[in-house]
Design a protein with these regions (language model features):
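C-terminal catalytic core of Y-nucleophile DNA break-rejoin enzymes
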Residues: 91-93, 102-103, 111-138, 149-171, ...
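Conserved catalytic core of the tyrosine transesterase superfamily
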Residues: 55-65
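Conserved hydrophobic/aromatic pocket- or pore-lining residues that grip, position, or stack substrates
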Residues: 4-7, 26, 50, 66, ...
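Hydrophobic recognition helices of helix-based DNA-binding modules
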Residues: 7-12, 133-136, 230, 234
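DNA breakage-rejoining catalytic core of tyrosine-based enzymes
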Residues: 18-20, 24, 30-52, 95, ...
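N-terminal DNA-binding recognition helix of tyrosine site-specific recombinases/integrases
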Residues: 1-25, 73
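C-terminal catalytic core of tyrosine-transesterase DNA break-rejoin enzymes
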Residues: 65, 69, 75-76, 199-211, ...
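Exposed loop/turn and edge beta-strand positions of beta-sandwich/beta-sheet ligand-binding modules
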Residues: 60, 119, 182, 213-216, ...
Length: 252
């Protein structure tokens, strides 16, 4: 593409062989590898099988249900805090995305804004998910009392570059964080409060692949399955795009 555009530019602007450069506004189409992948569309039977298998794993069950009923991205689900959930108004405020970097002594999980500007959105909290999250919160509060001082809490601290500009926000255990850091009420943690970020789905999906025999499925595929489900229920494509945080319906 660079050679083609350069040749036409020289022919037009340098040598005057042509009056108009036909390659001036030429752009290669964006290639999104993930969109090229064959997605797995979960059946209700598979979802029921998975939920039954992990009925004793409250954290993964709630993570799985959250994606099933919202179509949120993996990093968005794992970045949810209790401050994002409004049980009274039955809404979820999606405003964070979690990602990892090589561990540097303080932690490897970072929290930022959503993937795109339209990714920041407020969606409805269904009754099924509401009840699941309320029950999960009760258990989490119970374990906080049981573990007492041994329970792990987290803060978010600013990461600055050499010029002193804040460039990222790192999730750090409370006892390791800076004085000016702020507490974060992460939802999906181990019973002792340990935060695993998106790794919370890793071991369960090995079991799903190897023991349940649902091959090649990914946690991310719940997003597409949710979109197909609500489309089949009559939701307009523009509304589906908004729920998923897509700017363009072509992405959806």
């Amino acid at each position: 593409m660079k050679v083609l555009k350069g040749s036409f530019r020289d022919a037009c602007d340098v040598y005057g062989f042509i009056k108009y450069n036909p390659a001036r506004d030429l752009r290669l189409p964006r290639f999104d590898k993930r969109r090229e992948d064959i997605k797995h569309l979960y059946t209700q039977k598979e979802i029921d099988l998975i939920l039954n298998k992990f009925s004793n794993n409250d954290t993964f069950t709630c993570v799985f249900l959250t994606s099933c009923y919202t179509g949120m991205r993996t990093g968005e689900v794992c970045g949810l805090t209790w401050d994002d959930i409004d049980f009274e108004k039955e809404t979820i405020n999606i405003q964070h995305n979690v990602y990892d970097k090589p561990k540097d002594g303080k932690g490897r999980w970072y929290i930022g804004t959503t993937k795109t500007e339209t990714g920041t959105r407020k969606i409805h909290l269904s009754q099924t998910l509401k009840i699941a999250l309320q029950n999960y919160k009760k258990k989490q509060d119970y374990f906080k009392k049981i573990y007492g001082k041994r329970y792990i809490y987290y803060n978010v601290e600013d990461v600055k570059n050499q010029s002193g500009k804040v460039v990222e926000h790192r999730i750090v255990r409370e006892e390791l964080s800076n004085k000016d850091s702020e507490k974060i009420n992460l939802i999906f943690t181990r019973e002792n409060g340990l935060y695993l970020g998106t790794d919370i789905t890793r071991t369960p999906f090995k079991i799903i692949h190897n023991e349940l025999g649902i091959k090649k499925c990914r946690f991310y595929d719940l997003r597409g399955s949710y979109a197909i489900k609500i489309l089949n229920n009559g939701v307009e494509i523009r509304d589906v795009a908004d729920l998923l945080g897509h700017k363009n319906i072509e992405t959806t």
